[in-house]
Amino acid sequence: LHYPLRRQRQMCIRDRNSPIRVGCAGRTDAGVHATNQIVEFSTNSHRDMKAWVYGTNSHLPESISVNCGAIVPNNFSARHSAFSRRYLYVIYNSPIRSALLPEYLHREHRRLDHEKMDEAAQFLVGEKDFTSFRASKCQSSTAMRNVLSVEVSRQCDLILVDITANAFLLHMVRNIVGVLLDVGAGEKPISWPRLLLTFKDRTKASKTAPPNGLFLVGVRYETAIHIDMPDLVWPHFLGLQH
């Protein structure tokens, strides 16, 4: 969650008796989107859930919308209770720019082979050291992350990179996409991601993909924590089924 948005949410969810602090499931860079961000807060106020949802939305800008709400256990943490997070990166593979959705797509003019990209992405599945895929300013104490699945598919001129992991490093998804773009364009071999994992050197990898094509689409929690909310929400313009 970008800091200005976090502050804005705190201002919109106000309790007359005490200040409210919010926590979120995943932090997003400026320019990155979230269709299924989970935000939690504690309050002594008693309102029905419809009042919380509609009341909060009445104070939010059009770029932010609360979809639903739920009561959770006192020990629930949107961030630390999460079992996995799922991101989707949307690539518009065309030599001509899109005039309608430039803020929600990354246009790639090179013709991409999505099957090669998908094959290359499978080298990233599993618990591995993602030093080559983390930003230089990443403050995480370890580069070990467990990627549960990666799938690259094509829908006409759109290429979708769907990736799920227990957690992500700073710019990790965008750096992975940057590598897959070079593989799809034929400028790097399919084995390129595997080699980068062994190098453990960010400077040897591809350029970081822009933020505008990236969406946080899902957060899953342990089965012991029951939350009556969807764990996956696709961007509406894709027309995909949840």
Regions found by a protein language model. Name each.
Residues 1-13:
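Single conserved hydrophobic/aromatic residue that forms the stacking wall/gate
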Residues 10, 14-242:
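Structured-RNA-binding interfaces characteristic of tRNA pseudouridine synthases
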